[in-house]
Amino acid sequence: MMTAIDARLIAGMNTTGSAGLFEAACRVIPGGVNSTARATWAGWTPYPLFVESGQGSRLRDVDGNEYIDYLLGLGPMIFGHRPARVTEAVVDFIQKRGTVFALPTADEARLAEKIIAAVPSVDQVRLCNTGTEAVLYATRLARAFTKRSKIIRFEGMYHGFSDGVYWSKHPAIAKAGPDDHPVAVAQGPGMPKGVEENLIILPWNDAQLLADTIEREGDNIAAVLTEPVMCNTGCILPQPGYLEAMRELTQRRGIVLIFDEVITGFRLGLGGAQARLGIRPDLSVFAKGLGGGFPVAAMGGRADIMALVANGTVSMAGTYTANGIAVAAANAALDELATPGLYARLDAVSDELRLGLAQVLREANLPAYVVGLGPLMQVWFATQPIHNYRDAERHADQEIFRRWWEGMLARGVLFHPGAYENLFVSTAHTHADVAATLAAARQVAATLARGA
């Protein structure tokens, strides 16, 4: 049987360098990679591509193949690769000032002021290193503030890999309980027993079930934790009125509403998805786009909740938190993102891609459609609407998506091989990039339509 890599070689791609590096890496790194999203079991079979370099909207692998890059590091490369303003700010800071001091700098407050000015729901903000940390702090803070224990989280969402939330990301439906009463399914072994007792798992986009759950359990619920746009089961938009209902229900019962904007923050607009959609959460977490390619995250929100951090009731600590490199990168990134017209131009290129892909698929009579908001989108090979994780499991054709990915890769267009990831667009992408992408898409769609 022909493997995916055989198909790439036949299409004129040489990836033997990646094959050799992967074999060597497997001898010293478990699975040959340092993140599950790059692993063979995440779709990179029989091995992931090994990168030589990136520049702007392009990425080059070790075998010299060049791609229009819509993977973008899974989201943080909002400006594309090696953006001059961010890179220069980091190099300048290292050369002139240092890296880690274990003491504050004036740059931290300047960054906090920019975040607060950009995101209306944030009165105060604390920095950290990763989205996982930011979510951990937000849920801990919500529990401390409300003096309650339970967290509502939604099937199909990813909020980092801490024990308290690494549940029901993509569970087997047979193990996940009935549609209207899901059970918590651990992402894998090693989770302490009893953690799931403080989790309430719900399907997304079901306002009535959320209302019924809060009516029944409200006095025990500390927080509702959600992405404002579902980004870890492909791209799924909130149904009209759903987030508004969530906000009203949580506010009425004194439940902290936490928006995980690790992916959407500073990507869907300077104020994130919450500003774009007009919803004001109590706490928010940010990462990815905040650093313009450098590792930095933040958690912020209402002043009365954040006061528990100010007085030491809830501890947030870390040697590398607010290190000079991360803060310099984030300050430069937010300055660049504040450029007048930047998001309008980014949305225009993104809309051209999204609408163009939809037209290509429609003209090929493929059972597929494109869902997205601004520079975030995914192709669903499905005939039924997908509103939550279980819809995706039941209706999305993963095999056709795989063939779509292979065909696009062979034609120099890169995105993640998993249908539950997304295509990301950067400010470096051009109308010419979109035209080349759509030309490749027409060829692949025609091949898929013939059943090849």
Regions found by a protein language model. Give the residues of each.
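Conserved N-terminal phosphate-binding loop of PLP-dependent enzymes in the Aspartate aminotransferase
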Residues: 2-452
